[in-house]
Amino acid sequence: MYEVDHADVYDLFYLGRGKDYAAEASDIADLVRSRTPEASSLLDVACGTGTHLEHFTKEFGDTAGLELSEDMLTHARKRLPDATLHQGDMRDFRLGRKFSAVVSMFSSVGYLKTTEELGAAVASFAEHLEPGGVVVVEPWWFPETFADGWVSADVVRRDGRTVARVSHSVREGNATRMEVHFTVADPGKGVRHFSDVHLITLFHQAEYEAAFTAAGLRVEYLEGGPSGRGLFVGVPA
């Protein structure tokens, strides 16, 4: 999903654009403790470069991250040299321990292709949950909330670098096809450009809820969330 160039500019761009990882982690911690007051451990699934995990660790102490991309994990290890980080697939990972909370942020579950894969992922989340624990998932847009043809454009200047990002998103079958272009300029490397295409599944709300239910979780959908796409919260039924 993410290659070296993406991982290199990922944090710089989103931090420069104003994404507040600390506030988001604090809000998720409050949500977790509203369901599980004694929560003391957390697993961050699809942790990326560790920007949320860094702040989750301040909230819980006992944390771990799971990430599929080795490039992202390389950056996460630099950011969090003492963190417990695993390379693995959210659909079938087995870590041999359980957590008070299992969370997946930034709509990472949208990269799953089918309801079967979504169900397998949520079942893996539930498999790693302590009795009385909580699962929190930030979804991608639903079919009825996705804005077909959406164009996003931002320029970020940070740490001597300038990053311009433009994207165009259209509906393709049951997915969002997002074409993303980055132009990066810095004094040492000059100007470079890269692009890629993301296919992000437009699962229905009911399909998320069915995955939670099949995993033995009682599920609630909360509107809003960090990016306006809401949050699914599940506790053992």
Curated annotation (Swiss-Prot):
Q: Which reaction does it catalyse?
A: dTDP-3-amino-3,4,6-trideoxy-alpha-D-glucose + 2 S-adenosyl-L-methionine = dTDP-alpha-D-desosamine + 2 S-adenosyl-L-homocysteine + 2 H(+)
The highest taxon in the source lineage is Bacteria
According to UniProt, this protein's pathway is: Antibiotic biosynthesis
Single GO term (MF): protein homodimerization activity
In its UniProt entry, the species of origin is given as Streptomyces venezuelae
Task: Give the family this protein belongs to, as stated in its UniProt record.
Answer: Belongs to the methyltransferase TylM1/DesVI family.
How is the subunit organization of this protein annotated in UniProt?
Homodimer.
Q: Provide the E.C. number(s) assigned to this enzyme.
A: 2.1.1.234
Which residues of the sequence carry a binding annotation for S-adenosyl-L-methionine? 21, 46, 67, 89-90, 105
Q: Which residues bind substrate?
A: 14, 17, 145-147, 152, 165-169, 229
By which gene is this protein encoded? Answer: desVI
Keyword line:
Antibiotic biosynthesis, Methyltransferase, S-adenosyl-L-methionine, Transferase
PANTHER family attached to this UniProt entry: TRANS-ACONITATE 2-METHYLTRANSFERASE (PTHR43861:SF1), TRANS-ACONITATE 2-METHYLTRANSFERASE-RELATED (PTHR43861)
Q: What is this protein called?
A: dTDP-3-amino-3,4,6-trideoxy-alpha-D-glucopyranose N,N-dimethyltransferase
Per the entry, what this protein does is: S-adenosyl-L-methionine-dependent methyltransferase involved in the biosynthesis of desosamine, found in certain macrolide antibiotics such as erthyromycin, azithromycin, clarithromycin, and methymycin. Catalyzes the last step in the biosynthesis of dTDP-desosamine, i.e. the N,N-dimethylation of the 3-amino group of dTDP-3-amino-3,4,6-trideoxy-alpha-D-glucose.
Pfam families xref list: Methyltransf_25
